[in-house]
Amino acid sequence: FPGFDEPWCSHKFSSVFSFLQNNTLSRAELDATGDVLDIHYGDVLIKYGSILDATDNTIPHIISGHESTNYDYLQDGDIIVADTAEDETVGKTIELLNISGRKIEAGLHTVPCRPLFPFASMYLGYYMNTSHYHKQLIPLMQGIKVLSISKGNISKTEISSPQTIAEQEKISRFLYLLDQRATAQSKIIDALKKYKRGALKAVFTQQVSFSAKPQKWDKYKMGDLISLQSGQDFAPAEYNDQEIGVPYMTGASCIVKGETVVSRWTQTPRCYAYKGDTLLVCKGSGSGAVVRLTQEKVHIARQFMSLRANEKMTSDFCYYLTGFLSDRIKRNATGLIEGIDRGTVLNQTVFLPPLHEQKKIARFFSKLDFTITAHENMLDTLINERTGLMQRLFI
């Protein structure tokens, strides 16, 4: 930042922090209410960012009677390191903020620490999640299926910081404001998606109309309105990643941010789907997901069904109708590996408006999707900017 030209200083972790007590409570010993809050390592790894505001009402509480005795409760500026994970996210750190008298314990698989001398609020939370710091931890991690890092090894790392609190404050405040902006952007996206879910229900249950003179919607079975193409898997010898042949859509992994993407091709296609068809994931963890095909022509695997509208229904209306039906369809999924069968799709009872109203409905939801995508792109930009700044602001 302009006006700061002092060199940064570096100290051993062991000279910067003292270690604090943690508990070993499992999730089963936590609840939504209680007198003492608990910071679980799983939440540090996945749920929380670099800074945890203690006013966050999603922080779990310790069930009464399970609290630690003689515990030195955490304070503003304390950090909590997750010492165990399934991958190299070991070492993910949060800094606590706005404790204001709340009783907080550090939980299972965490290393709580207290600075021995002052730092700017939030500086340590951001610094300890930079690649500059985290790369020190990677060679110190131990384990095969599960990775962990010991207090002794954490103590070997170096903590770098500007010499002046003022420069630390500039860095942490700037990143915090950027995080707040990204959080607000996420809430906008969530609100738009919630609105879309409500609008889909209102439209397809005929609670609202897009026609000046509402007309009766006709009752059909889905099988009266579409042709349904099931997929077929290939052995590895029948596909390639050299872009030779026809794109091969293998499953939910081919859906990225609401778009179809291709990473495999085949020279022996048999089960075709075409641009504009609605694809329904019918097997596996992504079962029930719906996407519109953007490639000209593809072969689909068993994980997909392709729905192609006939002359009674527009392809865009088919896409949004299938999206509305997906939860209902998924509830009928069966088998050890969750699966949707053809009969479930074809036998869905649906109501269909005239073609001109179908087009109005599809245009409305298309504009809504465009708005959601624009806000998602804005969030991606904010996240990318933050990532770049995290690399450039710290040395």
Question: Where do the language-model regions lie?
Answer:
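Short beta-strand/loop turn elements enriched in aromatics
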Residues: 32-53, 234-252
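Amphipathic alpha-helical segments with low aromatic content
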Residues: 1-9, 156-157, 162-218, 344-347, ...
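Hydrophobic aliphatic residues
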Residues: 17, 128, 203, 226-229, ...
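Non-catalytic DNA-recognition/assembly elements of restriction-modification systems
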Residues: 1-23, 211-232, 352
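A short beta-sheet element
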Residues: 40-42, 51, 57-129, 250-252, ...
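A short glycine-rich beta-alpha junction/loop motif
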Residues: 25-27, 33, 102-110, 138-166, ...
